[in-house]
Structures are given as C-alpha cells and as structure tokens.
C-alpha cells in the first residue's frame, strides 16, 4: 500500500434543526411483479455526478484532493454501463437543489433507472454544497414515487461519498478462517430507492489524495468486474469486503493513522437489479 496521506469528508455544523417528514399515501402504479427490475428500456438512464472539491472560505472546509480521480473513475464506469453521465463540479447548496429538482421533472419514461453520485464533505443526513449544507432528504424527495412518476417502480440509486460523523474505526484483529396472487397495484412512495453510503452512520469516510476515495475506488472496480455477472446487492457486498479488508489509513497525525472503514448499504429496492439483460 502506498503511503500517501488520507483525508476525511467531514465538517461539523452546530445547531441544525431537525426536519419533520410527513407521511404520504401510496399511489396507483402498473408495476409488474417479476423478481427483477426491467432494465431493457431504450435507455439505461441518467447518472448525475456532483463533484464538490473547492468550498467557500466562509465554510471553513478544506479542498477535497483526490475527488477528481473519483469523478473520472465514475464517469468511465457508468458510461460503460450505458448510462448518460452528467458531471457537475463545485455546486452550491442552492444549485444542488435546483439541479435535482430539474432532473426529477424530466421525462424518464424511456429510462430503466436513475443514478446520482454525491462527492463532497458531509455529516449524518447531510451533504455539503460549496457554501453550506443540504439535507439529503431534500434531494432524494424529488424522486419519490408520487413526485417523479416516470421513475415510479424503477430503481433509484444514490451513491454518497461523504463523512457521516467524526467517529474513527480502529479495526480489530480477526481469525480468518411477492406472491403471484397479490394483485397489488400500489407501492409505497419511498420504494425502489437504494442508498450506498461510503461509511457507517457516525463515522469518517476516507479519501486518498492520489487514488481517490476507498469507497469509490472499490465500487468502480467491482462494477467493472461483476456488472455483467452479479446482482447489484451482491456487487455491493463485495465492495464492502474490499473496503473493509484492503484499506487502512496512513496519516502523520497518530489520531488518524491506521484506521478502517466499512460502507453501509440502505436498500428499499423491491426487486433484484441486474445491469445486464
């Protein structure tokens, strides 16, 4: 392992007000009850990459060296999967919200899925624009089934490379060694989302200044190797293992040296997801 120093994607913000999320009723939908998502629409879908590297001085946040490596790796990976990739750099929180709102209003009826990758500083439930924080829920809510009807019943993948707190994982040594007769045409508005977080709740997320973040490196490598062979959750399990076993932080600050990381997958997918068909 090359001893280039690792960084974290975190910025502590005090006195954030909690958001109250009101429930919503299900909506009518002609969803098929097959076990896997239909991925043979005319288009695979959009892949939006928001790559925030440089932040306003007023935020006190440092530049995220290595993030351009992640963005380039992601562009190549998802283009190879036939996604239409749109890369946006250094967006303010207002620009992030505006972009996500506009994308959600597009006609996705000929698209199989939707992918959004967020590369930035973060905290639990928060991603940072270049000038301040955005509630992740505010971003993802635009794509709920009752608000983005052309993506209803289709997989919506949010990949988030950012810290979720300030805890450090020191690691530990180990010894190796739906029924057909359910004619339901309503689905929950929060169904068919998947959130792939780079780290567990409350923890730092590591990024190498030369090679990019551990999580994005691993995600792209596993997609390139297995996207034509394995179901997506199986691929993400391999990503978890790669990050957990092959990476360890190197820092001249002893507090941040020899630390570990484990990604966290939160799935509300209702079917298996294969990128091939």
Curated annotation (Swiss-Prot):
Effect in UniProt of substituting residue 175 to A: In P3-D3A mutant; abolished cleavage and activation, leading to prevent thiol protease activity
Phosphoserine modification, residue list? 26
Prosegment residue ranges:
1-9, 10-28
Q: Which reaction does it catalyse?
A: Strict requirement for an Asp residue at positions P1 and P4. It has a preferred cleavage sequence of Asp-Xaa-Xaa-Asp-|- with a hydrophobic amino-acid residue at P2 and a hydrophilic amino-acid residue at P3, although Val or Ala are also accepted at this position
Among the GO molecular function terms of this UniProt record, one is: aspartic-type endopeptidase activity
Q: Does the entry feature the keyword Lipid metabolism, yes or no? A: no
Q: What class of enzyme is it?
A: hydrolase
Any one Gene Ontology biological process term?
apoptotic process
Localization annotation: Cytoplasm
Question: Which E.C. number(s) belong to this protein?
Answer: 3.4.22.56
On this chain, the residues bearing N6-acetyllysine are 11
Family the UniProt entry places it in = Belongs to the peptidase C14A family.
Q: What does this protein do?
A: Thiol protease that acts as a major effector caspase involved in the execution phase of apoptosis. Following cleavage and activation by initiator caspases (CASP8, CASP9 and/or CASP10), mediates execution of apoptosis by catalyzing cleavage of many proteins. At the onset of apoptosis, it proteolytically cleaves poly(ADP-ribose) polymerase PARP1 at a '216-Asp-|-Gly-217' bond. Cleaves and activates sterol regulatory element binding proteins (SREBPs) between the basic helix-loop-helix leucine zipper domain and the membrane attachment domain.
This chain belongs to the protein called Caspase-3
Report the source organism: Homo sapiens
Upper taxonomic classification of the species? Eukaryota, Metazoa, Chordata, Craniata, Vertebrata
